[in-house]
Amino acid sequence: MARTQELRPGVYVIGTENWRLNSGLVLGTQRALVVDTGAGPRQGREILAAIREITDLPLTVANTHAHYDHYMGNAVFARAGATEFWAHKACASAMAEVGEYQRSFVSTQEPEMGAGEGIDTRLVLPTNTLPGTGLRPSLTRIDLGERPVTLFFLGPGHTDNDVCVGVDDVVFCGDLIEEGADPNFEDAFPQRWVESLRALATLERYTAFVPGHGTPVSVNFVTQQADTMELAIQRARDVHRSEEGPSTAAMYRLPYQAGVARVFLDRWALIASQDAADATPPTTPEQLRTQSPDTPPSA
């Protein structure tokens, strides 16, 4: 059964057991925003049932990124009447490209979704995306009725399409922040992730940061995650420059568990070989001043 926590008046975290997922719910006077919908119809229905215990408002959905546990419940919400699904441009592209492949990842907990059979198993892709090219920081605002919500992209991190959702002093961060376990680096851009975390930590209006999995944290946790990742990057550079390579011994030099460290080293080597860390410019202080959730977006 889903666990519901009201962080602020009308701002809820809805936690479900599978993947320790945190979904969000923000209430306005005219509609409500749902942040992340789970990995399939079973989890999606559990989240929806918890929401309907709180409100019967029409629903809008935001997906924080294109990993299966954050969007494969979209069809449940489409059938419940949601017509707007927000995400980053690259998130929409990734869902379209790898969504069918990702079904295999949920086949145990969500057998219907894994097989693509039954009610609410179709892939529902974003209908609305953040403005701009998708490479630089961007934002958009949604009015829920006397309740503005900001969707913003600070740069690559856990993926190339991580969107945060800010309301009042609360921000839903998806897997840009990971609490209770090491970060997942399968699709990550480690150096850019550090930059995005540090940019997030400068947004002084936010005091409660809701990770995609785990318990809400403070800005100190965000900074600590950035510091730990920066240490891992430096040690990965040392390994990469040596003749040792991403060996078993090298894994234990990183501040992560061995399996995660191996993925990190492999990902770092791939990015280094492709020079991917320079694929997009870093988030600068000027961009934060002109394109942050605290100020109107520039033209």
Cite the ranges covered by each PLM segment.
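Divalent metal-coordination and catalytic microenvironments
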Residues: G10, V26, D36, I51, ...
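Conserved beta-strand hairpin/beta-sheet module of binuclear metal-dependent hydrolase folds
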Residues: A2-E53, V163-G174
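Short, conserved active-site entrance elements at the starts or edges of catalytic domains
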Residues: M1, L123-F152
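Accessory terminal helices/loops
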Residues: A201-R205, T215-A299
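Metallo-beta-lactamase
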Residues: A32-L33, A39-P41, R141, P148-D227, ...
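Short catalytic-loop micro-motif centered on adjacent basic/acidic residues
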Residues: V13, L33-D36, T60-N63, T150-L151
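Short acidic-hydrophobic surface loop/beta-edge motif
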Residues: Q5-E6, V26, P137-G145, P211
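Active-site HxH/HxHxD metal-binding segment of metal-dependent hydrolases
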Residues: R45, A49-L135, L231
